[in-house]
């Protein structure tokens, strides 16, 4: 066998996209200077977990990480897919961080993909699993992905800091994608959403729905927000609550906003076991519903911060696919 020629890259920017494109194009990459000047240099736990996930769904994939984690080599293999796979995503980032590149790779695998992901289903950093199911999967259908076999099942929920959620992702294989020209966002014609609560009173959900309807009912009549209260093992390991909203437009575009309220992770600046004051459920419903009806051109960091009185716990989803 000949010597492997690696394409050299620097830094940790857009790491998921780099790994996705390297895998699809079968291009070995070597990434250097990963946070080399930070107080905590090297790959983060969720980035290492993503590399291990790529190993799990691929055949003949090779990952080599140096001792400090500031450099790694990634030689992609053949994406095989497969059924009954299981991966623990950890609690550094939510499952949505892994779902976005995983669903693309699953489309081009040798076999249909069925994988169980464990970890955090809802947080304030990544798109929650409800948003992914309500917006990302229908978006893929616009590119010719069949609805048969494309499914995300939420079996239990988990929020920071300890997670405990589980989802089951199923992705069919395709031969090619259909090109799409899509420049008109259209006008909002209906709004769907879901609230959730884990290890807290279900009254939090009713309060969020009441606040959201206070905005939506003045604009359009077709609004349905469902509740999903979890208890027992399906409620994960930490208390929390949140909401996911999807506004569908006349052109088939999906405008989404979601958030989850829970106690902070230790790496988010909180102390393990420290009881912080949580954002009131009424404010959650009001702010997220306001973000959901923003024009898509205003979904930028500056606009989100200006309209976000918390400065941290709400996001309008652009995510992996962007705009």
What are these regions (language model features)?
Residues 1-323:
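Structural preference for solvent-exposed beta-strand-turn elements
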């Amino acid at each position: 066998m000949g010597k492997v020629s690696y394409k050299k890259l620097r830094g940790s920017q857009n790491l998921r996209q780099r790994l996705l494109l390297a895998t699809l194009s079968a291009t070995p990459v070597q990434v250097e200077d990963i946070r080399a000047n930070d107080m905590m240099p090297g790959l983060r736990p969720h980035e290492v977990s993503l590399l291990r996930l790529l190993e799990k769904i691929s055949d003949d994939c090779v990952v080599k990480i140096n001792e400090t984690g500031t450099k790694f080599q990634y030689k992609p293999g053949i994406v095989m897919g497969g059924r009954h796979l299981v991966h623990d995503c950890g609690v550094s980032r939510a499952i949505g961080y892994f779902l976005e590149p995983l669903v693309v790779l699953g489309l081009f695998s040798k076999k249909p993909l069925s994988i169980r992901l464990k970890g955090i289903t809802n947080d304030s950093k990544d798109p929650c699993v409800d948003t992914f199911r309500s917006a990302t999967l229908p978006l893929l259908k616009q590119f010719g992905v069949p609805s048969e076999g494309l499914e995300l099942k939420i079996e239990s929920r988990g929020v920071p800091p300890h997670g405990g959620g589980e989802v089951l992702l199923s992705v069919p294989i395709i031969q090619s994608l259909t090109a799409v020209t899509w420049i008109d966002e259209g006008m909002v014609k209906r709004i769907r959403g879901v609230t959730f609560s884990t290890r807290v009173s279900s009254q939090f959900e009713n309060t969020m729905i009441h606040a959201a309807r206070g905005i939506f009912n003045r604009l359009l009549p077709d609004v349905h927000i469902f509740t999903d209260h979890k208890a027992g093992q399906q409620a994960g390991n930490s208390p929390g609550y949140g909401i996911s909203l999807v506004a569908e437009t006349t052109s088939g575009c999906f405008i989404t906003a979601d958030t989850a309220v829970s106690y902070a992770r230790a790496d988010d600046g909180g102390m393990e076991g420290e009881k912080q004051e949580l954002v009131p459920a009424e404010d959650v419903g009001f702010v997220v519903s306001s973000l959901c009806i923003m024009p898509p051109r205003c979904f930028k960091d500056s606009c989100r911060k200006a309209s976000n009185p918390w400065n941290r716990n709400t996001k309008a989803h652009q995510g992996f696919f962007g705009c």
